[in-house]
C-alpha cells in the first residue's frame, strides 16, 4: 500500500476517495486516524474513527483502535453499537434503548460473553429476554437465579431447561409435572432426549432407555436406544434399534452410523449377514463410513482431487488475489476473493488453494457447495509440508494426525482466533502454549507463526498421547476438552461406546471429525 511507505495524509485521503469500496478502506482510515493524532489533529482522527467499521479491521488493529477511541474520549455508546464485543467494557457507562440492548446482547450471547449479556438484559421486558437471560445465568453457574428465571419465563424453551434442571436437582416429580403439562409433542421429545442423554453420559443406561422409549419415533431415539441396550449387553435389542435408526435416518452420515453399530451387534450375535452392515456403512458418509471403509480395505479419500470443470475458463480472479497476497496483505486478499465470488471459477478456487488452502475451502463451499467436485478438489490440502514433517519427526507424531487436527482446529488458517481465544493453526490457548513451551524449551516469539504453532501443537499431542498410553481417541478428546475433564467421564473400554457417550456434543463431534480427517490423510500421505 503506497500510503504505508510515506504516511502522506493527502495521498491517503485520495486513495479513500478514488477507491470507496476497497477491501482495505477501514484499515487505511485507522492509519490515517493514528497519524492525525500524531499531528495534533484529534478532531480529524475522531471523525475517521467514528466513520470506519471496526468489524472490518484486521484483528491485530482492533485493540489499538479501542485504546485510541478511549484516548480521544469519543462517545462510548457509538463505539459499543459499532462492535458490542470489542466495546463490551463500556456497558456500565452507557444507556441503551431496549432494542439496542437486545440486539447487542444477541451478538454477545453468540460469542459467549454471558456476564455482559446478563448486565444488558436485566432491565428489559422480562418475557422477551427470559430464555437468553436464564441460559446465560446457567452458563455462569448461577443456578438459583437461572432456576427462578426459567420458572417465571413463558418461553417454551425455558420449560425444557426447567425440566432438565429439576431432574438434575433430583426433583423428578416436578420434571414429570412439566412433561405432562406440555402439549407440543416435539418439545416433549426434545426434553426426553436430553434426559436420556444425561443418563447415558452418567452410565445410567436403563434409566436412559426409560426416557428414550417415551419419545416420538426418530433416528436419534432409536440410535440412542440401541446404544443403551448395547452398553447393557442386550445385543439383540440393540441390533433391532440400530436397524430402526437406519430406517429413520435422514443423512448418509446417520445411515452409516446406524449400519456400523448394527454390524457391531451382528458380530456379537454371530449373525451370518454381519458383513452386509459393514458394507452398507462404508457406502455412506462421515466417521463411521471412514471406519467401515478402512476395515474393508476400501479407499476413504475422495478420488475427485484436482478436478477442473471442462466448461470453465482459466483462472483470472486467482491472479488478483495472488497479487494482493504476495504484496503482504493476506487478509485483503481474502476479502477481495469474496467480493469477486460471482466471477469465481473452479480453476480459480484450485489455483487459490496453492496459495491459501483455508480461503480455497471456504470459497468452494460458498460457491459450489459442501461435497461438490470443487470442494473435494481442495478439501484436504497438505500445506506447510516441511514444517509438519519436521514436527512429526521430532515428536514421533504421524503427519496425518497433525494435519487431521490442524484441519479441524483452524482449517489451515494461521491467523485463526476462536471464541475461547485459541490461536493459530493448531488453536492453542495461551496457558497451554506457555505450558508446552516451558516443558519443551521453546521460545514463543509469535504464536501465529506456522512453525511455532505446529511445533507446539505436535508437542502437546505427544504429551497427551503419553498421558493416555497411546489412546488416540482420549488424546483427541483431551486436546479439545482438556485431560482433567476427560478423566471424569465414564471410561468405557469399547472406544466407539466411549466416543458416543462423551457428555459434550462439541467434543464428541470433534473426535469424530478429526478421526475422519486422520483416515483421509493417512491415505493421502502414503
PLM feature segments, named:
Residues 1-2, 31, 64, 68, ...:
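"A position-specific structural signal for the A-helix of alpha-solenoid helical repeats
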Residues 2-5, 99-113, 316-335:
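Alpha-helical segment of the N-proximal tetratricopeptide repeat
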Residues 6, 39, 111, 140, ...:
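Structural motif corresponding to the intra-repeat A-B loop/turn of tetratricopeptide repeats
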Residues 7-18, 76-94, 112-122, 141-149, ...:
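Repeat-mediated protein-protein interaction surfaces in helical alpha-solenoids
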Residues 17-27, 51-65, 85-96, 123-129, ...:
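Short solvent-exposed coil/turn linkers within tandem alpha-helical repeat scaffolds
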Residues 46-57, 70-73, 81-86, 125, ...:
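TPR/TPR-like (Sel1-like) alpha-helical repeat modules
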Residues 116, 145-148, 169-172, 176-198, ...:
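Catalytic glycan-binding domains that act on GlcNAc-containing polysaccharides
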Amino acid at each position: 500500500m503506497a500510503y504505508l511507505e510515506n504516511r502522506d495524509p493527502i495521498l491517503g485521503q485520495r486513495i479513500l476517495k478514488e477507491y470507496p469500496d476497497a477491501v482495505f478502506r477501514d484499515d487505511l482510515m485507522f492509519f490515517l486516524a493514528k497519524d492525525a493524532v500524531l499531528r495534533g489533529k484529534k478532531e480529524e482522527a475522531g471523525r475517521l474513527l467514528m466513520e470506519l467499521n471496526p468489524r472490518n479491521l484486521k484483528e491485530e488493529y482492533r485493540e489499538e483502535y479501542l485504546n485510541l477511541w478511549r484516548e480521544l474520549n469519543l462517545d462510548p455508546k457509538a463505539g459499543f453499537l459499532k462492535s458490542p464485543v470489542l466495546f463490551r467494557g463500556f456497558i456500565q457507562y452507557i444507556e441503551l434503548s431496549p432494542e439496542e440492548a437486545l440486539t447487542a446482547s444477541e451478538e454477545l450471547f453468540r460469542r459467549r460473553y454471558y456476564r455482559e449479556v446478563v448486565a444488558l438484559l436485566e432491565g428489559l421486558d422480562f418475557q422477551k429476554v427470559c430464555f437468553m437471560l436464564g441460559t446465560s445465568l446457567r452458563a455462569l453457574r448461577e443456578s438459583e437465579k437461572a432456576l427462578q428465571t426459567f420458572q417465571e419465563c413463558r418461553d417454551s424453551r425455558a420449560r425444557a431447561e426447567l425440566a432438565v434442571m429439576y431432574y438434575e436437582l433430583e426433583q423428578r416429580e416436578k420434571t414429570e409435572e412439566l412433561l405432562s403439562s406440555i402439549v407440543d409433542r416435539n418439545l416433549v421429545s426434545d426434553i426426553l432426549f436430553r434426559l436420556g442423554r444425561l443418563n447415558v453420559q452418567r452410565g445410567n443406561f436403563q434409566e436412559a432407555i426409560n426416557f428414550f422409549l417415551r419419545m416420538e419415533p426418530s433416528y436419534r431415539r432409536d440410535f440412542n436406544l440401541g446404544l443403551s441396550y448395547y452398553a447393557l449387553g442386550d445385543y439383540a435389542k440393540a441390533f433391532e434399534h440400530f436397524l430402526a435408526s437406519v430406517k429413520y435416518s435422514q443423512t448418509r452420515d446417520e445411515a452409516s452410523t446406524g449400519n456400523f453399530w448394527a454390524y457391531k451387534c451382528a458380530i456379537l450375535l454371530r449373525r451370518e449377514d454381519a458383513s452386509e452392515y459393514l458394507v452398507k456403512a462404508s457406502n455412506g458418509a462421515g466417521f463411521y463410513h471412514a471406519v467401515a471403509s478402512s476395515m474393508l480395505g476400501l479407499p476413504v479419500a475422495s478420488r475427485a482431487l484436482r478436478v477442473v470443470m471442462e466448461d470453465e475458463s482459466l483462472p483470472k480472479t486467482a491472479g488478483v488475489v495472488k497479487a494482493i497476497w504476495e504484496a503482504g496483505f493476506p487478509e485483503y486478499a481474502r476479502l477481495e476473493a469474496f467480493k469477486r465470488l460471482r466471477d469465481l471459477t473452479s480453476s480459480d478456487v484450485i489455483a487459490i488453494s496453492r496459495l491459501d488452502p483455508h480461503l480455497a475451502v471456504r470459497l468452494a463451499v460458498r460457491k459450489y457447495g459442501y461435497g461438490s467436485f470443487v470442494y473435494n478438489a481442495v478439501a484436504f490440502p497438505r500445506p506447510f509440508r516441511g514444517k509438519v514433517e519436521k514436527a512429526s519427526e521430532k515428536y514421533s507424531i504421524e503427519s496425518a494426525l497433525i494435519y487431521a487436527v490442524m484441519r479441524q482446529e483452524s482449517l489451515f488458517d494461521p491467523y485463526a482466533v476462536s471464541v475461547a481465544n485459541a490461536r493459530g493453526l493448531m488453536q492453542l490457548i495461551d496457558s497451554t502454549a506457555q505450558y508446552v513451551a516451558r516443558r519443551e524449551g521453546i521460545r514463543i516469539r509469535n504464536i501465529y507463526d506456522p512453525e511455532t504453532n505446529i511445533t507446539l501443537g505436535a508437542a502437546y499431542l505427544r504429551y497427551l498421547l503419553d498421558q493416555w498410553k497411546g489412546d488416540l481417541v482420549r488424546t483427541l478428546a483431551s486436546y479439545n476438552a482438556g485431560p482433567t475433564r476427560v478423566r471424569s467421564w465414564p471410561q468405557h473400554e469399547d472406544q466407539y461406546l466411549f466416543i458416543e457417550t462423551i457428555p459434550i456434543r462439541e467434543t464428541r463431534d470433534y473426535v469424530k471429525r478429526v478421526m475422519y480427517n486422520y483416515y483421509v490423510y493417512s491415505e493421502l500421505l502414503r
